[in-house]
Amino acid sequence: MSVSKSVVACVLGLAMTTGGAALAQTGDDPALKNMNACLSGTSPSSEAAFMTNLNPALNDPDRVAWCLFLYVNTNAATSGNNNALFETWASDNDTFQTNPVWPGPGSDVKPLRRPLLPNLKQQEPGGLTPFVLPFSSTQCQPGQLCVGEEVRRNKPTFDFIKDNKLYTRDGLRAYTKAITFPSDSIEVKANWVPASQLAQFLAGSGSPSNPSLYHLNTTVENGQTVQYALVSFHLISKMVPNWTWATFEHMNNPGRCDVIGCNDTFGANPPATAPHGNPGQQYPNCTKSAALSALFAGSKIDPAFTNYCLKGTQTDFTDAQGVQTRLGNSVTEQGFVDTASCITCHGRAAYSFATGGWSPNRVFLYNSTPIGPTGPLDPGQFWLYPQMDPMRPQNAPIFRATDFVWSIPFCAVDAAGNSRCVAK
């Protein structure tokens, strides 16, 4: 059995270390070593455990989610910031420029924007376009959800977009192959609240407004240093063809487990929390399991990250009985958690030149009405006649898929050098 374990560790370690070289970090990167060890898991004591370890992303997704969590949140602070590793990666602002550049160390600007999903508006002649505006703490108004958002991608993801010129519409028109990201790709979508606005964010939930319980970082707005608290984030990786999907929230988020509950079979005790009948309230803290506590103890990470909870993971569009799976968090999918499915929503990420112009695919099913798609993808979203004779080539494509990455159709730079995701 020790030989089998060595094979598992070798396969997983090789896959992740190969990606590690592309991360532009030192060859002896302790964060990557920790993640490789975490993904390999404990030495299997049975054939079932051995087989589970062969494909942990599908067989043990909650553990894999925490392995990724500890990796992307590895302490990367330098003078003047409190960066986790993902905060040093490329943002949409870095990626969707006429000349994308990997960010340098120690930036004091966090490129926050208003959350994308609640701010979609209809585009003529069809489809939806993101209504993206820069976010700052000065925009916070009484009675409004005051949240900023950012998307970050690691070096392999950034390089794939840059090297294939997928950051411009002209580049997408010229790229004739199927878009398939490398297996070491990782993306994070993070939501932040100004620390000074935490009381308003938590109002009515019974949660304490204590910034020390949060991962905090600062940015410069109008020449002033402003502190932000991390409240939630999505985390995806290309370990499997349809990516891994996980969402995390701070333990004190109002309504954290509303509608779909919270489920974490690896890191939480108890592993499942049912939704309250009265929405918007505080839920009990997600007490960490002994296995997860041991992983935290061996990681170089801001201690405040122990206050974050895995809301859930997603590995497929449906369960084994064909029931549509759902996943969404109370901040990013605020207002439509009941119809949120990360894998289905991102599976619709696509663009079209079919009418001669440019159009990203719709996010919501009914234009700007916030009803998300769930379940398997509809081939009619991509092909004009998807049910034609299977022995003949499919008819004209309508939309071209972007391998579950919405930033490409949302943010691709137009002929004038502008991106809808980048403030000028």
Regions found by a protein language model. Give the residues of each.
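Bacterial N-terminal signal peptides that target proteins for export
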Residues: 1-10
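Bacterial N-terminal signal peptides
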Residues: 9-18
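Sec/Tat signal peptide C-region and signal peptidase I cleavage site
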Residues: 20-24
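Conserved small-residue
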Residues: 25-344, 348-424
